[in-house]
Each structure stands twice: as C-alpha cells, then as structure tokens.
Amino acid sequence: MYVIGVTGKGKSKLLEHCLFQDIRAGRGCILIDPHGDLAQDVLRLCLTRRVLLSGDDRLIYFDPARRDYVIPFNVLNTPGTPYEIAQRVVEAFRRTWPESLNEAPHFSNVATAALMTLAAQRLTLIDMHRLLVDRDWREALLERVNDREVVGFFRERYDRWGRDAPLLRESTLNKVAAFTFNPALRLVLGQRENRLDLRRIMDEGQVLLVDLGRCDGETRRLLGSLLVTGLEQAAASRQDVPSATRRPCYAYIDEFQDFAANPGSVKSLTQILSECRKFGLHLTLAHQNLSQLSERMWGAIGNIQTRIIFGVARQDAEWFAREIGRVDTQAVKHEAQTETQHPLFAPLAEQWEEWTVRLRELPPRQAFVSAPDGSATRIWTIAIPPYRVTDEQVEELCRASLRRYGVPYQAAERAIRARQEESGPNALAPPFSEALSANGGIRRAPQGC
C-alpha cells in the first residue's frame, strides 16, 4: 500500500489505525518511524484499547537514543553467508550516502572484504575501523579466513597501497566514523549479540516499533536503511517455508524514500516490493510529496495496487489526477438551447484540472483510494477523541519492553570498553572460530586454527 499527503491531512492517523488493527488481529507488525510521534501514538491507542499491556512480550520498542537501555542490533550476526551479510550492509551504506559513495571507486571492494572478514568472526561494525588501520590485528583475523579472494585483496592489494593507502581507504573510514563516534550507534551496533531478529519477528507475529525521532539525520538514515535491508533479507530467507504456511507480516515505513530504493540503491523499488510480497512481507510506504522521490521510483508508485492520496501540493495533484482521475469525452458543459445548436462538450483539460483541484483541496481526514481495478473512491475518516493515557503509562510500556529485550546502557558501555582494551586475535574471537569457505559460506573450525 502507498500513502501520500502533506502535513496535517491525516496520513499519520491512517497509519496509526491500520497498525492498530493489525496488532489487535495478532499479526506481525513492524513500524519504522523517523519522527517518533507515530510510534508513541500507536502505543497510546493500544493502551486505550487494552491491546498491548506491559506484560505482553510481543512488543519490541526500539529507540536508539535512549540512555537507560540498549537493544543490541549486530547486523553482522544475522542469517546468511558472510558475502550475503556484507552485500546487505554495503547496500545500506549506499542508501545512506548515495552521492558520496557513487564517487568512491574503492569503497565497495574495501567495505565488502572487511565486512566479510568481520561477519565470519561474528564481530561488529565498530570493529571495522580497527580492521582497516591495525595491520597486526587484521593479519590475525585473516589467518582464520579460507576465502582466497578476501585474503588476496588485503595482502596483495590493500597492504601494497603504501603511502596511497590513507587516501584510498578514506571513503570507507569516513563512513565507519559515523557509527564509531556516535554514542547511540556505537552501543546499538557494537554489541556482539543481536536481539533484533527480524526473521523471528515475522515468523512469530511480534510487534517491532522503531522510534528514530530523537536521532540526527545521518543516524536515522543509516539505522533505517540497515533495518529495511535486513527486512528484505529476512523476507527472502523465508523461502525455506512453504508459501501456504508463511505467516504474513506487515511493515509500515514512513518517509520510505530515505531507506528504500533511493538513488544509491542497487535494487529498484519494484524489485523490493515484488520480492517482499512473494515471501509474505507486506509493505506500506508513506511520505509527503513526489519531489522526495527519484524518477525511477515514480514508475513503481504507479504499479502499486492500493494507493491512498490525501491532500497534496499542486504539482503532485497534477500527476495523481492523471493516475487516478477519469474524464468523459461525452461530458456536456452547456446544453443546446435550440434545435439548430449543438451542445458544448467539456474540454478534457478542464476535466483534468477539476481532478487536480479536488486532490489539492482535500480537507483533513479525506482522501482518494485508488483500487487495483483502477477505480478511485473518496473516503472520509472519523475524528477520534483524545486518548486518556498518561505519558507515564506509555513510558512504563516502553520500559517493560526494553527490560525484556534490552541491555542496561552502562552494561553495554562496559562490554565495548572491555573489548577495546583487549588485544590479540583470541580476545575478539567468538566462542568457536568461524572461517570463510571458498564459496563465501561459514564453516566451523577447531578453536585456534
């Protein structure tokens, strides 16, 4: 489903109630909210209707800006081969920094080789800086790597860049700095454990609310992109489950253009929608205006079967008028007054303009719904009375979820500090060694091999 509307027209309230209905029905739901208000309003509505209470273990509330609990999200400790994991993270980087990385020719090779090495050891993104600048530590890790291409890249190319190395690896290190210097990202992405198991959330019908409202723009884009690429991979991994038994999961992504199929993305939006739907992940994409989208996204928007258009700006109204509007070549503007006169037919340009005005001047809580059969229906939504829920009740629901799935903030800091103070390959190795096989997979090897 696709939803568009400028601020104040009712788009967020529609998403809120769609989410609530899915949660109440016991469906798996995921919300990525870049502003934070929608996630909080969903909790208020659920508390008012007594759907999600503090004892409900379905709820996972993820707010990386909190200073009491951290939910570990180790994107390198996820299902898939090291190569698949690396490609997913590189794709998220490209969606976060599309312009700068398109101009960095060495980024893809450096990042892929580094991420494959770290993923095989079940390390974290914040270890990437040390891997790239500490040759002794890098060599200790490469001793455990069986993939000749990865080893060859570092020993035969990377280590031979000499004085040019700082310049050639700078594009990668600049992006690594985004999460090594940022306290929120460092603690979330720097834990060895991963407690945001997106595949499990889908399969078990859990509710993940991601509140990015207090994050800065770069943090918001990076975490959102990592989550969306993770959702794409988790959905694709469900091919091992018969289609008839795949539990549907519904993901709502507000301001989706920042996280999916933007100019830096390898995948097109059409590909993402098709692949996710095939494996039981149903996406609802929302944003404010078409100028936020690249041209290649526009065609995909036209192919989405269900579109809901709230009040939009003039330019957008003109585009959607042609998409959902209908004109009548036989429509009469003025009837003939005498037998010798002919009726005056309504010019098509005027009819298209009428549709444009309708879309532009839609009052709040009114929208046009474009159905799969091409018809468009105008809808009205009712006003909802304010929720009689206190901020303290919402906070208690969040804290109950964080206590269940999170790690105390100070404990997360201590864990990373302890790892940084350790040295040697065994200090950062996992309980069992994992080596990259020649085909990019992971195989177990005896400790110390």
Label for each model-derived stretch:
Residues 1, 102, 270-273, 293-435, ...:
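P-loop NTPase motor core of the ASCE superfamily
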Residues 4-9, 14-281, 285, 294-297, ...:
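P-loop NTPase motor domains
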Residues 288:
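Active-site glycine-centered loops adjacent to acidic/histidine catalytic or metal-binding residues
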